[in-house]
């Protein structure tokens, strides 16, 4: 209870608007969206903040942004601007935040704090700290948060005392225990990240490794899972939660707590290898413990998270202090890891550009789990299970609904196709910050009755949705992050004998063989996407041959068992070198 109270209290004192928005999103309540829309319609026009707040709760961030940009800042009080600016930053709408907050000189504390939040959001970390220092005391939660995070980005490391270190392996045998440190995990998070982690570990278990996991400090309480247990055992893998009695929410203190928890686990387990994943804050704790105990460690680079961060911001974010430091810290931990693991050739090339030796890097691509090794569910049966008609053609995706996935382009392409193909349906499975915006766009395009949005589904049901599709679509936007990172869901679609139409980006070329397992189209062109879809929708034999070829390729090249065999050998070589 103390940890829960600390998490809620710190978030409310730091950025209450963002915390309320995140909490409302986790509810995933349609009634909440309806309530926001209803209340917004009843409020008088002068109730500016309440109008904006109900739009925010409804999840329609596009409409909220339009509303905020329509307001005249000079006619609004400092306090009102502060509240509206906080909403703009919370929904990641920098244009609206700039419209409201820039060029307003003030000594008002609330408005200055909002301006600092916008500066921080843009990556101007030192500027945000200096602005806060002029208006709030050193004890202010927001200021302490920013200072601590800036310290970590600038090089602060956790420190272990002598009692927590200097353990070395003894004897001639190589310990066959691997300790993993993760950002999140099953059963509380069902993301591709969590599924990949679990697949790697269960497959390593089949190779004779004992696996145990620690998750980041405060998780899963920090995502609202207040009834979580201290340990979850899933398929023989123990997921232990780091839930300290005195939880620290500042980044530096949190990394320190994580290092202490890892040191404790090392003394208990005597592991042969430590393994963690992006981002670098995970690696700082693992690196500190690995060096103190003389244990090899693997850094698994699953994304270029500085680019992911920049993808939701103006182009100027790539010249910001945060972006520069983020890149530097990621390169620093990768350079210090005993071994680096990544998802594909595009990401390996980026690591080599950062100065990581080729010989130090190996690839474990996103792969298919045991359920996808089974024969795909026949399409008619899958649709019957889901209540979908065999009279329709379904195009769509199973994905996190975020902006860089480019699903608005899919809807625009569908709007071009539907007049000539009224049997066409768009199936978008998943949840995320763009969910309400996509539904709103489908209404604006006049195709809402042709679109199905089931929301987030259990991972075992995702396979059924894959099998129900005629074509799986990956219309990702052309960004640094999408050029480098290979997603998991298209791999699963191909394993289900579903052809894939995808944006022609380097990472997606590693998955889709153009003309054989799917079609690659120039990114960010709804018309070209529509043309590729039209061609495949009109050729059932081509869809069938592409689907069969895709499944053969996935079974031959992308299984977790094959990944685990290679990773197990890597673990053994690393541990053997340090005996």
Stretches with model-predicted labels:
Residues 437-461:
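Nucleotide-activated donor-binding/catalytic signature segment of Leloir-type glycosyltransferases, i.e.
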Residues 384, 423, 528, 535, ...:
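A short, well-ordered alpha-helix in the C-terminal region of glycosyltransferases
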Residues 1-53, 59, 139-232, 237:
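N-terminal subdomain of nucleotide-sugar transferases
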Residues 164-166, 374-388:
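A short helix/loop element that forms part of the nucleotide-sugar donor recognition site in Leloir-type
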Residues 474, 492-495, 499-502:
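Short hydrophobic beta-strand element within catalytic cores of glycosyltransferases
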Residues 217, 346, 367:
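Carbohydrate-associated surface elements
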Residues 178-180, 389-414:
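Conserved donor-binding/catalytic core segment of Leloir-type glycosyltransferases
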Residues 514-515, 519-526, 535-541:
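Conserved acidic donor-binding segment of nucleotide-sugar-dependent glycosyltransferases
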């Amino acid at each position: 209870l103390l940890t829960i109270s600390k998490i809620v209290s710190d978030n409310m004192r730091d950025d209450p608007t963002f915390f309320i928005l995140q909490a409302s999103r986790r509810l995933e309540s349609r009634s909440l969206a309806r309530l926001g829309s209803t209340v917004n319609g009843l409020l008088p026009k002068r109730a500016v903040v309440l109008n904006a707040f109900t739009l925010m709760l409804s999840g329609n961030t596009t409409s909220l942004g339009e509303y905020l940009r329509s307001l005249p800042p000079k006619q609004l009080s400092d306090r009102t601007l502060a509240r509206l600016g906080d909403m703009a930053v919370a929904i990641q709408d920098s244009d609206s935040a700039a419209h409201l907050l820039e060029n307003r000189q003030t000594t008002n504390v609330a408005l200055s704090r909002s301006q600092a939040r916008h500066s921080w959001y843009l990556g101007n970390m030192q500027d945000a700290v200096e602005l806060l220092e002029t208006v709030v005391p050193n004890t202010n939660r927001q200021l302490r948060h920013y200072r601590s995070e800036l310290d970590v980005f600038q090089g602060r490391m956790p420190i272990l005392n002598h009692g927590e270190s200097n353990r070395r392996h003894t004897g001639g045998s190589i310990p066959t225990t691997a300790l993993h440190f993760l950002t999140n995990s099953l059963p509380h998070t069902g993301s591709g990240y969590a599924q990949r982690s679990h697949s790697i570990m269960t497959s390593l278990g089949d190779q004779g490794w004992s696996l145990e996991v620690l998750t980041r400090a405060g998780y899963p309480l920090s995502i609202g899972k207040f009834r979580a247990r201290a340990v979850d055992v899933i398929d023989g893998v123990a997921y232990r939660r780091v839930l300290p009695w005195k939880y620290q929410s500042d980044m530096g203190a949190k990394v320190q707590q994580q290092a202490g928890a890892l040191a404790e686990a090392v003394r208990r387990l005597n592991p042969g290898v430590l393994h963690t994943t992006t981002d670098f804050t995970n690696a700082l704790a693992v690196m500190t413990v690995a060096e103190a105990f003389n244990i090899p460690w693997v850094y698994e680079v699953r994304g270029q998270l500085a680019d992911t961060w920049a993808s939701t911001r103006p182009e100027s974010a790539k010249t910001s202090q945060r972006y520069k430091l983020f890149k530097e810290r990621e390169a620093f931990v990768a350079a210090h890891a005993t071994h680096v693991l990544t998802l594909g050739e595009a990401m390996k090339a980026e690591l080599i550009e950062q100065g990581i030796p080729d010989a130090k890097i190996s690839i474990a691509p996103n792969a298919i789990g045991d359920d996808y090794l089974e024969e795909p569910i026949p399409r008619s049966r899958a649709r019957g299970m889901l209540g979908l008609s065999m009279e329709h053609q379904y195009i769509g995706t199973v994905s996190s609904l975020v902006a860089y996935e480019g699903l608005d382009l899919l809807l625009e392409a569908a709007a071009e196709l539907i007049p000539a193909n009224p049997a066409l349906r768009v199936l978008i499975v998943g949840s995320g910050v763009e969910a309400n915006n996509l539904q709103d766009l489908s209404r604006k395009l006049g195709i809402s009755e042709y679109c199905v949005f089931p929301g987030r589904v259990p991972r075992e049901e995702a396979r059924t949705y894959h099998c129900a599709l005629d074509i799986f679509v990956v219309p990702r936007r052309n960004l640094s992050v999408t050029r480098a990172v290979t997603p998991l869901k298209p791999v699963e679609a191909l394993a289900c004998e579903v052809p894939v139409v995808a944006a022609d980006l380097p990472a997606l070329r590693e998955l889709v063989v153009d003309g054989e397992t799917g079609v690659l189209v120039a990114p960010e062109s709804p018309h070209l996407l529509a043309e590729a879809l039209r061609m495949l929708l009109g050729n059932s034999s081509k869809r069938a041959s592409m689907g069969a070829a895709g499944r053969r390729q996935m079974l031959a090249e992308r299984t977790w068992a094959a990944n685990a065999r290679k990773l197990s050998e890597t673990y053994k070589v690393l541990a053997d070198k340090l005996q």
